[in-house]
Amino acid sequence: MQKYDIHGKGVPELHHAEELEEQLKKIATKEMYESFHWRTRSGTPNSDAPHAVNASNAKISKDIMINLLPLLEKCFPSIVFRITGDYLYGPGDAIDEHTNSNDPSDLLYITYATGESSFSYRFSLDDDFIETPDYKNGLTLRAFTLTSSPPFTYHKVDCKSGYRVSIGLRYAQL
């Protein structure tokens, strides 16, 4: 498992990691990817946009997320959260740089990746991106803060190969 404490506040403690990994591994497949609603958005890139202007990924089904919720609650007993992102990326899928500035909070991204994929971020458009690779065939946790005004956490995702489950939790510590 890989952890990235981007905001410096610590990454929420994960309990039952093996159980969560097992469940996300079942989702990170070609068969699941092809069964979900695939979406693509395209337009003129805008780094300051709250949501990615250009995106390609699949939305994980509501039934799967409802069934996954009790496990997420068991895995993260020290936080209260709401799920704000539930996507499966396939080979070549990505979302471009955006801020999520319309929903400021602390955010935990949980990923399970079967291939080469990454999350990149920066705090200023003048800075280079800091790329954080996903742990292959395992879990990656990233904790960071979203703000409604600068400095933003500009971020994007690339899935070069394999499949990448991404679950976003807006959270507060208990």
Q: What does each model-found stretch correspond to?
A:
Residues 1-78:
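Non-heme Fe(II)/2-oxoglutarate
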Residues 3-5, 140, 156:
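Ser/Thr- (and often Asn-) enriched beta-sheet segments in non-cytosolic proteins
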Residues 6-8, 41, 83, 90, ...:
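Intrinsically disordered, low-complexity segments enriched in small/polar residues
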Residues 66-76, 109, 130-131, 156:
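Intrinsically disordered, low-complexity boundary segments flanking structured domains
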Residues 79-151:
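Catalytic core of non-heme Fe(II) oxygenases with the double-stranded beta-helix
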Residues 149-166:
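Ligand-binding loop in jelly-roll beta-barrel domains
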Residues 167-171:
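Conserved SAM-binding loop
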